[in-house]
C-alpha cells in the first residue's frame, strides 16, 4: 500500500534548478504531474529506476518534460507544460 504523497518542491513553471524539501531518494516512488491548459498528465517512477543521472523524461500529446534529480535538487527542462508538481510516495 502506498502512503500519502508529499510535495517535494514548489510548482515548477519554467526551466531551471529547484530545491527539493528533502532528498528524492527518501521515497520509493516519484509521482510527477504535468499540467497544460485543462489537461493533466501524470507519471510514476520508481526512484531506483530513474536511471543514470536520475532522469525522468515525459512526452505526452506534444508536451515534453525532462527532470534531472540530484540529492536535494531537480533541474527541469519544460516544453509546453504550464506547471509541474513533484511528489514522493512510500
What spans do the regions from the language model cover?
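Noncatalytic modules at the cell exterior or secretory-pathway interfaces
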Residues: 68-77
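Contiguous ligand/interfacial binding patches
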Residues: 49-66
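A signal for long, low-complexity, Ser/Thr/Asn-enriched, surface-exposed stalk/shaft
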Residues: 1-4
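Short, structured beta-strand segments at or near domain termini in extracellular proteins/domains
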Residues: 79-90
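Nucleic-acid endonuclease domains
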Residues: 17-19, 61-66, 80
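Surface-exposed ligand/attachment interfaces on beta-rich extracellular proteins
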Residues: 7-27, 36-42
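Short, surface-exposed terminal/edge motifs of secreted or surface/virion proteins that either
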Residues: 38-52
Amino acid at each position: 500500500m502506498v502512503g500519502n504523497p508529499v510535495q517535494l518542491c514548489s510548482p515548477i513553471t519554467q526551466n531551471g534548478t529547484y530545491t527539493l524539501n528533502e532528498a528524492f531518494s527518501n521515497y520509493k516512488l516519484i509521482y510527477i504531474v504535468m499540467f497544460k491548459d485543462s489537461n493533466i498528465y501524470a507519471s510514476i517512477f520508481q526512484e531506483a529506476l530513474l536511471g543514470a543521472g536520475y532522469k525522468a523524461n515525459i512526452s505526452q500529446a506534444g508536451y515534453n518534460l525532462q527532470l534531472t534529480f540530484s540529492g536535494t535538487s531537480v533541474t527541469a527542462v519544460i516544453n509546453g507544460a504550464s506547471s509541474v508538481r513533484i511528489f514522493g510516495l512510500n
